[in-house]
């Protein structure tokens, strides 16, 4: 298994990126300014993009695993890699997600309504607010 940084032609992984963020123009907002990593385990299985949000905050903007390989720990391996790589440079690792019943703390009201051109659904529930989860590094 190998995790490698992708510097060029990041859109070749668009099929993976759209698993986590289904609207391409939203992906375009962070794709080039972010640092992209792919996890290769006999082929690319997962990806993530992180951005520097200032004030010591590193944000996971996109993280996805191919459907046939989900729940096998690939995303966890990417997160562990990010923590190890960036713990000296940043004090917080955060990720934003939808307001599904399984998520909690910091909520940005109406994020999905205000920023997407169509309703976004997860497990049959329309996402409205953005929830931020943080880990101190």
Regions found by a protein language model. Name each.
Residues 1-26:
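Short amphipathic alpha-helix that is part of the acyltransferase structural core
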Residues 38, 43-64:
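Conserved beta-strand in the GNAT
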Residues 63-70, 98:
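A short, internal acetyl-CoA/4′-phosphopantetheine-binding micro-motif in the GNAT/acyltransferase core
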Residues 69, 73-81:
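Conserved acetyl-CoA pyrophosphate-binding loop and the N-cap/start of the following alpha-helix
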Residues 85-99:
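Conserved GNAT acetyl-CoA-binding A-motif
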Residues 99-100, 104, 108-137:
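C-terminal "cap" of GNAT-fold acetyltransferases
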């Amino acid at each position: 298994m190998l995790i490698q940084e992708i510097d060029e032609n990041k859109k070749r992984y668009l099929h993976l990126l759209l698993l986590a963020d289904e609207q391409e123009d939203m992906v375009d907002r962070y794709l080039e300014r972010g640092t992209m990593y792919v996890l290769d385990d006999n082929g690319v299985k997962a990806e993530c993009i992180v951005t520097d949000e200032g004030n010591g905050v590193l944000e996971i903007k996109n993280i996805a695993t191919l459907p046939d390989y989900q729940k096998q720990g690939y995303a966890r391996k990417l997160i562990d890699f990010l923590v190890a790589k960036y713990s000296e440079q940043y004090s917080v690792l955060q990720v934003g997600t939808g307001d599904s019943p399984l998520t909690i703390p910091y909520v940005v009201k109406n994020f999905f309504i205000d920023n997407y051109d169509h309703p976004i659904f997860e497990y049959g529930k329309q996402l409205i607010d953005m929830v931020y989860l943080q880990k101190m590094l």
